[in-house]
């Protein structure tokens, strides 16, 4: 599979108490490095249209991953993938709850869901636009630590969890 070489680009792990800047980097690449490479290829006048289109699609996906906190989670539990929980009594894991289960439970298209989200104030938009990828990684990491504290192993999560965390 030609996509296998990008698998390490979907997450970034570093120890609790460290920052991305001070952490040891994955030699295969990580989320931050993947975003940077995509940006470089998209902006490179020597890149052909096919490369630019592929890397633009990948960049959009990686930015989505960056904003799902467990993609900046702990290596030892694979970003919550080994933390078993229940979602409306069905077996799953914490990562899956945050990747898909909460979104699917709204039973809306992504367009409908985005239309129903709270909008940002002008000041919030400006702060987001001034942010860097590293700012977003650090924010996502802080949120990941809160996500870890939000559920216990084998806990049954449902509407209350969605209300509190989505």
List PLM regions with ranges:
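N-terminal, motif-rich segments that launch catalysis or mediate targeting to/interaction with membranes
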Residues: 1-60, 69, 74-166
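Positively charged, low-complexity nucleic-acid-binding target-recognition regions
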Residues: 66
């Amino acid at each position: 599979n030609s996509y296998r070489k990008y698998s390490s680009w979907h997450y970034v792990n570093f120890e609790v108490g460290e920052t991305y800047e001070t952490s040891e980097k994955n030699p295969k690449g990580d989320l931050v490095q993947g975003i940077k490479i995509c940006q470089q290829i998209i902006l490179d006048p020597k890149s052909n249209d096919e490369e630019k289109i592929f890397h633009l699609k990948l960049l959009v996906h990686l930015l989505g991953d960056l904003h799902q906190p467990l993609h900046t989670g702990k290596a030892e539990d694979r970003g919550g993938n080994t933390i078993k929980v229940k979602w409306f009594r069905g077996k799953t894991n914490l990562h899956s709850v945050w990747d898909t289960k909460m979104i699917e439970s709204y039973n809306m298209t992504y367009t409908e869901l985005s239309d129903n989200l709270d909008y940002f104030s002008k000041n919030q938009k400006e702060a987001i636009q001034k942010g860097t990828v590293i700012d977003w990684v650090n924010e996502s990491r802080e949120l990941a630590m809160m996500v870890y504290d939000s559920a216990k192993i084998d806990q049954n999560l449902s509407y209350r969890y969605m209300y509190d965390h989505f």
